[in-house]
Amino acid sequence: MPAKIIDGKTIAQTIRSEVAVRVQQRVAAGRRAPGLAVVLVGENPASQIYVASKRRACEEVGFVSRSYDLPDTTSEAELLNLIDQLNNDSDIDGILVQLPLPAGIDNVKVLERIQPDKDVDGFHPYNIGRLCQRAPKLRPCTPRGIATLLERCGINTYGLNAVIIGASNIVGRPMSLELLLAGCTTTVTHRFTKDLRHHVEQADLLIVAVGKPNFIPGEWIKPGAIVIDVGINRLEDGKVIGDVDFETASERASWISPVPGGVGPMTVATLIQNTLQACEEYHDVERIEGC
């Protein structure tokens, strides 16, 4: 039986609609709409596409959206100065600096300059530490989005053997923490992993995030497994595919996320959720005064 499709596009739209309702309620009650600042340095075409989708999502849910498009000649000091200004701006609840940054700018220094309570990407050491301590606040967007996909599809993750392919700071490593919270026994594989096929064949839940088209052959998938494909790879003919051989894998898996239309929309929806959360948990005047 073919796998059930995990429709990230529909679930993401539902989440955005839920956030929009909450924003309308806030405004009707005389409170301000959440504010998100999006910073883009340089003219990377892929980054421009991602940033545009995030700005559209902000407008759709009624957020205040501020855009800062900086030239690729921007210095690290200039970027850090902008972040300092946004940290001190009471109308801004979230700051997103689109990665990658141009050569000569230290990604780590920039991300750590964002106040943890405005770190809606969830990359600051404070927020990663909270997730590690099982007391999450603002969680990394893609891992949280995947956890939400599984939850909204009614998939029980407790006791599953979960395997993550890829150990990046953006997906693989924080995803392992999310899956521990979700009750999985979790393995993270990477470029030094031996016998990758063996690990894949043991996975009840497989999450692949390596950025290589059709990296995982479908015949490796354990029958009945849940497959989450994070990869977004554009071929020479313009077609976009994932890291998993979808056609073959979908004949073996019980659930599978497509590319496009799976994880990608959830990353943006989670950014919107995180911005609302930052506003309501950290920055609402009424809440702060009541502490």
From Swiss-Prot:
Pathway annotation: One-carbon metabolism; tetrahydrofolate interconversion
Keyword terms: Amino-acid biosynthesis, Histidine biosynthesis, Hydrolase, Methionine biosynthesis, Multifunctional enzyme, NADP, One-carbon metabolism, Oxidoreductase, Purine biosynthesis
Highest taxon of source: Bacteria
Entry EC number(s): 1.5.1.5, 3.5.4.9
Pfam family, one: THF_DHG_CYH
Record-linked CDD domains: NAD_bind_m-THF_DH_Cyclohyd
GO molecular function: methenyltetrahydrofolate cyclohydrolase activity; methylenetetrahydrofolate dehydrogenase (NADP+) activity
NCBIfam families assigned: PRK10792.1 (NF008058), PRK14186.1 (NF010783)
Complex and partners: Homodimer.
Protein name: Bifunctional protein FolD
